[in-house]
Amino acid sequence: IIISGPSAGAHLTSLLVYDKEIQNRMNVDLKGVIGFIGVGGPYSFSTKTTTAVKLLLNQLFQKGYDRTLGEPCSRMAKSSVPMLLIQSKHDGLIDYSCAELMYKRALEIGNRCELYSVEDKNNTHSWYTAGMFLEKREENKTLDKFLCWIEQCC
């Protein structure tokens, strides 16, 4: 099993895979999980954020709430599950530094992690997080990376 999610799905699935407290509380068994792929996820709320993300965070978290309690980057524990983070420097919604922080944190605690920077011309948030699946892997470097990484895990 390889767990993956785009955007908010990357946020939630990364918590599922790398947050031991959530795993214990929800009785999550990761024995069959051999990889995680996050695509354009908001892994940290302390990085540069767009107005849209700020509005969403203000709706999700009460004023004064410690938002690090909801950050995959802050809650990540040591894990044997390797990680691929796919992020665009031209995302427009989620800043590239979000993925960079997650990548650095993973390496810092000894987790295997790779950060892939989207090179395709269609590199905005909606396009590469979902639209890449509308193309063939020969046409889309990001989709090819996604599929190659899965093939390497198997």
Could you describe each region identified by the protein language model?
Residues 1, 83, 112-114:
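Hydrophobic anchor at the start of a short beta-strand
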Residues 1-51:
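Primarily recognizes the serine-hydrolase "nucleophile elbow" in alpha/beta-hydrolase
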Residues 6-7, 39-42, 87-89, 118-121:
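Active-site-proximal beta-strand/loop segments in catalytic clefts of secreted hydrolases
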Residues 32-34, 80-82, 111:
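Loop/turn elements at helix/coil->beta-strand transitions in domains of secreted/extracellular proteins
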Residues 41-75:
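Mobile cap/lid helix-loop segments that gate and shape the active-site cleft of serine hydrolases
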Residues 79, 85-87, 91:
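Short beta-strand/loop motif that positions the catalytic acidic residue
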Residues 92-101:
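Conserved alpha/beta-hydrolase "acid-adjacent" motif
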Residues 100-104, 108-154:
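C-terminal catalytic histidine-bearing segment of alpha/beta-hydrolase fold enzymes
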